């Protein structure tokens, strides 16, 4: 019995509130000088009435604020882990709509990102096509990062990266890809053209189709080349893509060429 009493006494001591400047006694209990609510309360334990420490209103608000801040910190860590897991290229993790030029192409992609829940439920993706260097990869990555910001798993990769990833088999590739609610496959048509590559490309896209999960593809191929490929082995792949993804033509300027020109101007200025 003495052990129980000693333990109870220890709990009571630990529950004793800290008296701060402005605190006061009222009705035999300690009150907070800030919020005017009690920092002590009376509790009946057996035949005895004990005075124990309790949280005043402002202490409770502080505790809730700390809990919220910790939950937000944990969520930021979780999102960052998802981002690192889904986007191997560190630079691509920084592609955001906030840093993008406000163009019609970007606005359309932003609408898709803003309504991703609808796209996820419908299993609808995008096919971003157009000439090289006009921002397709950037825009697709902006969508992925916007989705990740909401804590939804997304992956940005390419078939060359997948094919060189050292997977044990195609089934392992499919399982890995389907962990992500959004999959961005960059530069379709740039992969090696051999039987293994062909089957892997088809398997990834077909498994995505079967899973009902959205897929965003970027490509330099035209819609005509996708509808009527020179290599008929790709017909079933491109048919799947056109079935799953809404085509969005990127008519933007060649940003890589513009950047190259800017770099050249900078160099010329240095050489003056």
Model-derived features: where do they sit?
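Residue-level preference for the first positions of well-ordered beta-strands
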Residues: 123-127, 154, 182, 214
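Walker B catalytic acidic pair
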Residues: 187-188
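P-loop NTPase catalytic core of nucleic-acid-dependent motor ATPases
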Residues: 94, 105-125
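Walker A/P-loop nucleotide-binding motif
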Residues: 121-140
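Short loop/turn elements that form and flank the Walker-type P-loop nucleotide-binding site
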Residues: 121-122, 150, 177-179, 210-212
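Short glycine-rich substrate-engagement loop in P-loop NTPases that contacts/grips substrate
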Residues: 106-113, 144-182, 191-199
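A short, basic N-terminal segment
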Residues: 1-106, 259-272
């Amino acid at each position: 019995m003495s052990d129980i009493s000693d333990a109870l006494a220890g709990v009571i001591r630990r529950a004793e509130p800290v008296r701060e400047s402005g605190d006061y006694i009222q009705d035999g209990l300690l009150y907070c000088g800030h919020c005017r609510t009690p920092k002590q309360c009376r509790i009946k334990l057996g035949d005895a009435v004990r005075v124990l420490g309790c949280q005043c209103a402002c202490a409770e608000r502080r505790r809730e604020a700390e809990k919220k801040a910790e939950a937000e910190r944990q969520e930021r860590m979780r999102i960052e882990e998802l981002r690192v897991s889904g986007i191997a290229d560190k630079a691509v993790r920084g592609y955001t709509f906030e840093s993008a030029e406000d163009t019609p192409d970007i606005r359309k992609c932003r609408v898709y990102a803003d309504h991703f829940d609808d796209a996820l439920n419908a299993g609808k993706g995008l096919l971003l096509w157009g000439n090289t260097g006009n921002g397709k990869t950037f825009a697709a990555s902006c969508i992925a990062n916007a989705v990740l910001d909401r804590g939804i798993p997304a992956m940005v990769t390419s078939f060359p990266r997948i094919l060189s990833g050292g997977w044990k088999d195609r089934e392992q590739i499919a399982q890995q890809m389907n962990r992500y609610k959004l999959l961005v496959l960059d530069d379709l048509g740039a992969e090696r053209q051999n039987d293994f590559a062909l089957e892997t490309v088809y398997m990834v896209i077909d498994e995505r189709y079967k899973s009902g999960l959205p897929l965003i593809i970027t490509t330099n191929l035209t819609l005509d080349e996708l509808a009527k490929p020179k290599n008929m082995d790709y017909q079933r792949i491109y048919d799947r893509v056109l079935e799953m993804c809404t085509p969005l033509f990127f008519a933007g300027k060649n940003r890589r060429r513009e950047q190259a020109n800017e770099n050249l101007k900078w160099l010329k200025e240095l050489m003056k």
